[in-house]
């Protein structure tokens, strides 16, 4: 017979009573009556915040943008194939946020800032909300520093400043991504953190861009955020905000950042898909009523911080794709009205072999010469005027048979200036090379050449300068002024190179 010791039993009971925790844990839960097309309807999930994260039984996470009288509409961050009708859902009490750190540089991540490049986990000690409020008026200062793109047409006539939002707009296959990636390549050694956000692109296109960055040594100062065409609409919609949160992390640490959104047309389409599935009322072109706010709250996060916040900056060139050059469509007009200028890329110019295919006549930067160094201002003013006059004359010359000598000369100069703006892809130019190129063109040094020889002559001149006249680049870089000494050195270099060029060509 087992001996029962009352003192042991009483000790066990006493210990259990002391360990009893009276704390009641309240969990906000609901059930799934309906799921499909990346949308779940949740019944019984009371007191859920707008945009709160919710977690399903199978581990899938969703965002709750719609709170209705009898249910909550949730968009899923995944395919949701394992979510079953009647399964439970738990509110997390958190708004969507991502981890941030310096370790993200050189990595490829998705819209949830999770690495997808196979290089292992990214260490991060802090996090930021995906949707942060934009800096206020007092937190900003006016844009005054240039963000060099390395493209003559932009840096001379449509200059972009640090903290500006300059739209890149054009039809498909007109070189929009090339302009953006060249700008990122040109930031090498400029102490600028770059973020490339690819929304709804083909995986092969994104891989090509990443390879270009890696080959040219640009990946070490760049973060690539990508959600491909086969990603859920929710993640395509979130990707730009994730990129902005990463850029803000560096901006508020007194650094300069450049974030490219490629492209916001696809983000708007993903948002339209989400909204229609959530049964929100459609508006113009079936977009929901708040599609303007979708882009304005994203682009307003780009800023040039004031001195109290460390003078960091976030420059945002968004890309918009037009259909058959129609810039009066809903999304293009929205983004044009939000941004500080636009660069129009023309399919006609692209097909005519003028690349980058920038239509200088209708492109504009609302910051203007405030975002140029003095040396560029000195040479660029004449270029824009001469190209504008050439465009008018060219249209007139199509109908006139006999033109006087002055008009013929002006047309010849204009054709050579247009050649001067042509550049190969992934070959951005330093500001001193641009100043030399523009000065050569606007002062008529290329007028004696055949139109087809101009590009070759200028490429060889840019190669000749660093080896034979290195002091020219030193003066421009150190003083940022096109001084008389620099002009004399350049004139001498042009004269010497012209003799070499003509002797080579005559052979």
From Swiss-Prot:
GO MF annotations, alphabetized: ADP binding; ATP binding; proton-transporting ATP synthase activity, rotational mechanism
CDD domains, sorted? ATP-synt_F1_alpha_C, ATP-synt_F1_alpha_N, F1-ATPase_alpha_CD
- Annotated signal sequence is none
Summarize where ATP binds, as residue positions.
Answer: 170-177
Keyword Ion transport included in the entry's annotation: yes
Query: What InterPro entries does its record include?
Result: ATP_synth_asu-like_sf (IPR023366), ATP_synth_asu_C (IPR000793), ATP_synth_asu_C_sf (IPR038376), ATP_synth_F1_a_nt-bd_dom (IPR033732), ATP_synth_F1_asu (IPR005294), ATPase_a/bsu_AS (IPR020003), ATPase_F1/V1/A1_a/bsu_N (IPR004100), ATPase_F1/V1/A1_a/bsu_N_sf (IPR036121)
EC number(s) in its UniProt entry?
A: 7.1.2.2
Membrane topology according to the record = Peripheral membrane protein
**Keywords of the record:** ATP synthesis, ATP-binding, CF(1), Hydrogen ion transport, Ion transport, Membrane, Nucleotide-binding, Plastid, Translocase, Transport
For the site labelled Required for activity, the residues are 363
Protein's UniProt keywords contain Transmembrane helix: no
The terms describing its cellular component in GO are: plastid membrane; proton-transporting ATP synthase complex
- Give its localization: Plastid membrane
Which reaction is the catalytic activity of this chain?
Answer: ATP + H2O + 4 H(+)(in) = ADP + phosphate + 5 H(+)(out)
Q: What's the main place this protein lives?
A: plastid
Tell me its family: Belongs to the ATPase alpha/beta chains family.
Subunit annotation: F-type ATPases have 2 components, CF(1) - the catalytic core - and CF(0) - the membrane proton channel. CF(1) has five subunits: alpha(3), beta(3), gamma(1), delta(1), epsilon(1). CF(0) has four main subunits: a, b, b' and c.
Task performed by this protein: Produces ATP from ADP in the presence of a proton gradient across the membrane. The alpha chain is a regulatory subunit.
Listed name of the protein? ATP synthase subunit alpha, plastid
